[in-house]
């Protein structure tokens, strides 16, 4: 079997209601999808994440001009070989960022082909499923005004509860006083209802303010405090980690085994959050997972993107061992973004859907998606 072609699809659509996280306003949804075709007729799908405000054309250009020429004619099942070929070819200019996202999308598609060629889901190739269903947590609580939205966000918490979620992650980073008002309102709305809360500031604060916010919320029993400071500042992570009795999480903006080696060696986080669609794909993810396990750090993937990224991440999360074995161990949970995203339910025949706060792990070959090509045409970005 040989790789015959690699195509990218840049999707874009304006949002009816723009929303904000701490780093800016999201006014449209983007996606960079990757299709690898073979001379045998098998096709694999992957996704290169459009993180934050990243346009899809960046990763698409990297795939077309840097990766595709060195992969045509190769056996797509040579997963480690091709990952290293791509990495070494782009190392001098692409160890992180959009270039690594491009590599990730291709790698995911190759694993999809490998699974399909054997008739097994990718989690089987990764060593099997530790779990056949995964608890989902609602990521949301984005802003539509900026500040002063505690009442609306409290109502959102109630909606998530009614929709079956028993774990929720609240987006903060809009000023500490506003953050605390939001958290109090959310807690009041969920009073008497068993719910696990998490917070994510998307690196909005420096060390002093990150610690100040955490100390004010130490009595909440947070499952995690995500990205308290900037990803380039591991010393800051260490300072926050040492100052608080809250599990610290981070890593969505870190890449490959090499990046996580430095991140984990400083004992800066309790929970590592690589994103499959930018950390280097399945090939890098399994190495990052082994490294984290050796450091006693739980891996809980960051998940953002289309139905393809979600499906691939579900395969990975099924295969992740717990960091601390126990009869009632803390299991990885699935980040279920509840904001508007048309490239999910519409894009594939059987999207990732939660029911009563849980997601079943599919056993379809590869990553388990069948793409609706009409959606690729409907949302094609104009170049």
Label each PLM-derived region with a short phrase:
Residues 1-5, 9, 116, 120-132, ...:
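N-terminal amphipathic alpha-helix/helix-capping segment at the start of soluble metabolic enzymes
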Residues 1-40, 45-52, 340-347:
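Structured beta-strand/loop patches that form or line metal/cofactor-binding pockets in enzymes
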Residues 127-244:
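Metal-dependent enolase-superfamily TIM-barrel catalytic cores that perform enediolate-based chemistry
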Residues 365-383:
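Extended hydrophobic packing segments that form well-structured cores
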Residues 3, 34, 41, 67, ...:
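Conserved, mostly hydrophobic/aromatic
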Residues 37-117:
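Metal- or metallocofactor-binding catalytic centers and their adjacent structured scaffolds
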């Amino acid at each position: 079997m040989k790789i015959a072609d690699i195509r990218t699809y840049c999707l874009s659509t304006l949002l009816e209601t723009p929303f904000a996280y701490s780093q800016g306003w999201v006014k449209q949804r983007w996606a960079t999808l990757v299709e690898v075709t073979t001379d045998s007729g098998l096709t694999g799908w992957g996704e290169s994440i459009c993180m934050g405000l990243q346009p899809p054309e960046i990763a698409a250009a990297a795939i077309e001009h840097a990766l595709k020429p060195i992969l045509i004619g190769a056996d797509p099942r040579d997963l480690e070989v091709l990952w290293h070929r791509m990495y070494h070819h782009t190392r001098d200019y692409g160890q992180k960022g959009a270039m690594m996202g491009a590599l990730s999308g291709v790698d995911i598609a190759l694993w999809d082909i490998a699974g399909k060629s054997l008739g097994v889901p990718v989690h089987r190739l990764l060593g099997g499923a530790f779990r056949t269903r995964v608890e989902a947590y609602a990521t949301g609580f984005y802003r539509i005004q900026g500040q002063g939205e505690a009442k609306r966000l409290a109502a959102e918490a109630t909606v998530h509860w009614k929709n079956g979620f028993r774990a929720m992650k609240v987006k903060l980073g809009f000023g500490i006083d506003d953050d605390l008002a939001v958290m109090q309102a959310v807690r009041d709305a969920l009073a008497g209802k068993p719910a696990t809360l998490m917070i994510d500031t998307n690196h909005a604060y420096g060390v002093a303010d990150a610690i100040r916010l955490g100390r004010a919320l130490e009595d909440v029993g947070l499952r995690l405090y995500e990205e308290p400071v900037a990803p380039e500042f591991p010393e800051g992570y260490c300072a926050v980690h040492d100052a608080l009795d809250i599990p610290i999480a981070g890593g969505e903006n870190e890449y490959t085994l090499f990046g996580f080696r430095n991140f984990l060696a400083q004992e800066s986080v309790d929970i590592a959050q690589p994103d499959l669609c930018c950390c280097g794909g399945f090939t890098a993810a399994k190495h990052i997972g082994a490294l984290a396990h050796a450091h006693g750090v739980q891996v809980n993937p960051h998940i953002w993107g289309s139905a393809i990224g979600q499906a691939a991440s579900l395969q990975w999360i099924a295969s992740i061992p717990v960091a601390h074995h126990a009869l009632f161990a803390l299991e990885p949970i699935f980040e279920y973004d509840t904001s508007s995203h048309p490239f999910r339910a519409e894009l594939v025949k059987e999207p990732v859907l939660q029911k009563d706060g849980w997601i079943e792990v599919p056993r379809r070959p590869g990553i388990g998606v069948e793409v609706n090509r009409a959606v690729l045409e409907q949302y094609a970005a104009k170049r």
